[in-house]
Amino acid sequence: TTSNHGWYILKSEDGKCDMDYYNMAGEKAENVLLASCGRQLEGDQAERITVGTNYADPEDLDPKTNTFRKTTVLFPVSNRDAKAVRLSTGKIINDFPEMFQEEPAEPYAPGMAFATSMAQFILNQGKVYYFWPYTSALSKFSVELARNETFDPYRISKYMMYATPNPIGFDEVSTSFVAIPGNRTTLISMTDMPGTELSANHTQMNLLWAGSKGLYDIEHYAVMQEQQDPSRKFIAYITCLGNSMTIKRDNLESTDPAYGASLFTLNHSSSQILYFVNGHELWSRSIAAVPGVNSKLEVVLPEGEIVFIKHMPYSVYGKPEESFDYLLIGAVKDGNYEVVGYTLDAVGRPADPEPALHFAGKGKVGDVTFVFPNVSG
């Protein structure tokens, strides 16, 4: 197959979402879902592509064990839909309602799917669902997790922090950070560690963005805005130990380029860097200490509105020629996307102002991922 070693670009176009695929030879397959299955994702906003491993394939029954064989899938997610797509063929094996034990509430609004070593998670209308990929015979998402024992209303933001032992989400109803377990029926309220500058609970903040440098890290970052005074924004330096956290504030002046930024991503390698986009400018910000220090990156950016940013490192042991370390930027102009990748140097800055990677197609890019035959979530 040629569908499991290359680049997938999740995009929106004409009120639908689909994926373009580029293999390692540079060959392009447009609208993979439409071409292979005759249907696309509903929704006009492409959100995220997640990889799921050990997913029970409902079309591949093992007659000896009477169980479904496991496979690797992509979860392309829009603001209105998500599907399970077999990586080896690019074909849809489960539509959104088929991915659940019980029919999910309508209108469908996933927005986010993510995985940890323990469980595979998905959102719908801000509610959390999960299953255990290694032990689940059917790979069906559970009934929704409750906020607490009193079933208070909640709505989890699409921005996640990958802490240990549980990922950390933000409840937009109570404006509180919560741990999202893959082994119980309720979310877990975070507790404050000594020295925190902001309680994890009832923050009275809007979460504009959040992320982690890597899986199972203790250091995380967020961009937050005060609800009572929306002109006040800050970068939150978050340390998580178990289900406790401490938050330090790096307040942003209105003249700071990060104050008016529209997109953020972290460097996921060794560098303590936050990248962001302000207008048609690309910036980096050292987050090794408070306050952070900004630096404008002089690179040749694609034309049009910049709508996507992501750091994507990939290392193959003993094969440096197959490894890469890209800062990806996506733009849209006249209904067409352009995605470029800048090779980063050892300190996390573009080694060359010209991009080393380039993709172009129809639609507006929402996410980009790289896959290979033994990829895991």
PLM features per residue range, with description:
Residues D81-K296:
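Acidic, serine/threonine- and glycine-rich low-complexity intrinsically disordered segments
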Residues Y326-G377:
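Blade-level signature of beta-propeller repeat domains, shared across WD40, Kelch, NHL, RCC1
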Residues W7-D81:
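Conserved, compact domain cores that house catalytic/ligand-binding motifs in diverse enzymes
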Residues L41-E47, N201, T255-G260, L301-S315, ...:
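Repeat-based blade/solenoid architectures
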Residues P257-G341:
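Loop/turn-rich, solvent-exposed surfaces of beta-rich toroidal or solenoidal domains
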Residues T1-N4:
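Beta-strand-enriched, solvent-exposed domains that form extended recognition/catalytic surfaces
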Residues G26, T89, A289-P291, L344-G348:
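Short coil turn/linker residues within repeat-based beta-strand modules
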Residues W7, V73-L74, Q120, P167, ...:
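Hydrophobic beta-strand positions that form the internal "hydrophobic ladder"
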